[in-house]
């Protein structure tokens, strides 16, 4: 695992916005950033007792992707964590992309940062989908690159800038993936 760009993590709470390639992205975000941070994760993870316990200890919030009302409540809880001084990790694609093209970045995932007025830190993950391929129970050796990109301030952002932010972040991470892959 090669992680670069830790110097781009500002002091204070931020929202880390990362692409989501594979099952190991959550442990990677917990171990490769400046410190373990709460994550926004799908509610299905709560069914795995060992993982649920430590995620609850980290103040992670669980999102029901099929319930828009609960999803809004989840993002409100994440925004509260930001107000308490925690940083939050989110995967705005909402699902794994298995190393393929990035999916759409959901605006709601970014909205908590703009409402809290905290910076957004884009994080590019490449190679994590190779550690455990979809449908496999085996862990495989793989080269994983994580690049922490410069933060984007959300303080005082105009409405049109806020609307453009999800696509801007998606494009930044996609461009970084292209650079990593040469």
Regions found by a protein language model. Name each.
Residues 6-8, 29-31, 52-53, 79-80, ...:
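Short secondary-structure boundary/capping segments
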Residues 1-14:
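Membrane-anchoring hydrophobic helices of lipid-metabolizing enzymes
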Residues 11-68:
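Catalytic core of membrane glycerolipid acyltransferases/transacylases, capturing the structured
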Residues 8-11, 47, 68-71, 152-157:
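A short acidic, often aromatic-flanked loop/helix-cap motif at beta-alpha or helix-coil junctions
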Residues 4, 40-42, 64-65, 92, ...:
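Thr-Gly-centered strand-to-loop micro-motif
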Residues 72-182:
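Non-catalytic C-terminal accessory region of glycerolipid acyltransferases
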Residues 1-4, 24-26, 75-77, 132-134:
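A generic local structural motif
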Residues 3, 16, 39, 146-148:
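Generic preference for hydrophobic
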């Amino acid at each position: 695992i090669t992680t670069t760009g830790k110097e781009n993590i500002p002091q204070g709470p931020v929202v880390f916005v990362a692409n989501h390639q594979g099952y190991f992205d959550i442990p990677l975000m917990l171990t490769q950033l400046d410190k373990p941070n709460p994550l926004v994760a799908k509610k299905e993870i709560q069914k795995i007792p060992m993982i649920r316990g430590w995620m609850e200890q980290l103040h992670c919030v669980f999102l029901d992707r099929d319930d828009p009302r609960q999803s809004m409540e989840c993002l409100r809880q994440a925004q509260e964590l930001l107000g308490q001084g925690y940083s939050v990790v989110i995967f705005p694609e909402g699902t794994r992309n298995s190393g393929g093209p990035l999916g759409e970045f959901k605006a709601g995932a970014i909205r908590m940062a703009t409402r809290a007025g905290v910076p957004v830190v884009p994080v590019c993950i490449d190679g994590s989908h190779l550690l455990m391929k979809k449908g496999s129970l085996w862990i495989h050796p793989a080269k994983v690159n994580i690049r922490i990109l410069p933060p984007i301030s959300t303080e005082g952002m105009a409405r049109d800038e806020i609307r453009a932010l999800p696509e801007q972040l998606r494009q930044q991470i996609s461009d970084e993936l292209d650079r990593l892959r040469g």
